[in-house]
Regions:
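Small/polar-rich, solvent-exposed N-terminal microdomains that initiate assembly or binding
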Residues: 1-70, 115-119, 158-163
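Extracellular/virion structural assembly segments
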Residues: 11, 71-75, 83-109
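Short helix-to-loop capping/linker segments positioned immediately adjacent to catalytic or ligand/cofactor-binding
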Residues: 67-68, 89, 131-135
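Oligomerization/assembly interface segments of phage tail-like spikes and tubes
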Residues: 71-88, 138-154
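Short, charged, solvent-exposed linker or helix-capping segments at domain edges/interfaces
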Residues: 91-94, 155-163
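Generic structural signal for alpha-helix termini and adjacent loop/cap motifs
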Residues: 110-114
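Glycine-rich, aromatic-bearing surface loops/beta-hairpins
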Residues: 116-153
Length: 163
């Protein structure tokens, strides 16, 4: 038998990764995103991501838990790091950063429960790292807090034990 080592937390992170990986610049047709992410990974951006047009890294940071029988209530902060490499005819790096932040915030709030896996998702803030207007690439981060819960006895189980 294959062991089940997938926590509720991991299913939420996987849902977020799936959302960003599925993004296409021209989709949905009625209201396109305008961005297709070249690389999306769990973890911080790496040096090789500088060669990509749009890079995204999902970085979970310290999580707070409170015990509320029969649940453990969790508040997970996730940093969504991004890097955009500027092409010759693009708008300014500052505008590219704002566009990327808009797309990230839109994705994080379209389904705040991540398919009923979480209770809520809230944007906690954002930051852009721009040195000069002539920068070839721009980086930034959008912080989100995801509230979810799991069974008091099992982090894989989102259902309370009422027995």
């Amino acid at each position: 038998m294959t062991p089940n080592v997938t926590s509720v937390r991991q299913t939420i992170l996987d849902a977020i990764l799936t959302k960003f990986r599925a993004m296409e610049a021209d989709q949905p047709v009625s209201d396109p995103y305008g961005i297709t992410w070249s690389t999306v990974a769990l973890g911080p951006l790496a040096g090789f991501d500088q060669r990509k047009r749009y890079s995204l890294g999902l970085v979970p940071v310290p999580e707070k838990e409170t015990f509320q029988m029969p649940y453990v209530m969790c508040f997970l902060t996730v940093n969504v790091e991004f890097r955009v490499t500027r092409n010759q005819d693009d708008v300014s790096p500052g505008h590219l950063a704002e566009q990327a932040l808009c797309v990230i915030k839109r994705a994080l709030t379209e389904d705040r429960t991540w398919g009923q896996r979480a209770i809520d998702t809230k944007i906690a803030g954002s930051e852009v790292d721009l040195v000069t207007y002539a920068d070839r690439s721009v980086e930034g981060v959008c912080m989100a807090t995801i509230q979810y819960r799991y069974n008091y006895e099992d982090p894989r189980n989102p259902t309370p034990d009422l027995g």
